């Protein structure tokens, strides 16, 4: 189960200077623009083959301050690269501090006993992104 993109975008901070880069391959920029207007610009790196160029994807992820991802290759690669990562899914493992003990830079938005809700995950993700931005200033 994945949160809906429109739910995630609704809770993302709207501050100037924030760039959202899509790490999802096959994204249709024109469709996204029509569906979401100019409220938030979701950028794609058109020259990057996100299916066959894993080194390029790793380089892109390494250049980001924060990654938000469902449980996909992007999530696991981001965590392995040491990039601060918000998981919109349940943790694979969980420590008593709430994080993933294998990847201390990965923050799951759901506890193992919670029922998945796209809006709940999106709201928590937005708050976590906002906290990250505040701490980075």
Question: Where are the model-predicted features located?
Answer:
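Donor-binding and catalytic core of enzymes assembling or modifying cell-surface/extracellular glycoconjugates
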Residues: 4-87
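Nucleotide-sugar donor-binding patch of glycosyltransferase catalytic domains
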Residues: 34-42, 47, 76-135
């Amino acid at each position: 189960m994945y949160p809906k993109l429109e739910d995630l975008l609704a809770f993302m901070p709207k501050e100037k200077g924030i760039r959202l880069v899509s790490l999802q391959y096959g994204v249709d920029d024109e469709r996204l623009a029509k569906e979401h207007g100019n409220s938030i610009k979701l950028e794609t790196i058109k020259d990057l083959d996100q299916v066959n160029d894993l080194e390029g994807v790793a380089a892109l992820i390494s250049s980001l301050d924060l990654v938000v991802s469902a449980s996909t290759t992007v999530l696991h690669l981001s965590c392995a690269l040491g990039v601060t990562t918000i998981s919109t899914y349940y943790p694979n493992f969980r420590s008593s501090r709430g994080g993933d003990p294998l990847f201390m830079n990965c923050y799951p938005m759901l506890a193992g006993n919670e029922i998945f809700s796209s809006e709940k995950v999106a709201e928590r993700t937005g708050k976590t992104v906002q906290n990250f931005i505040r701490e980075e200033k």
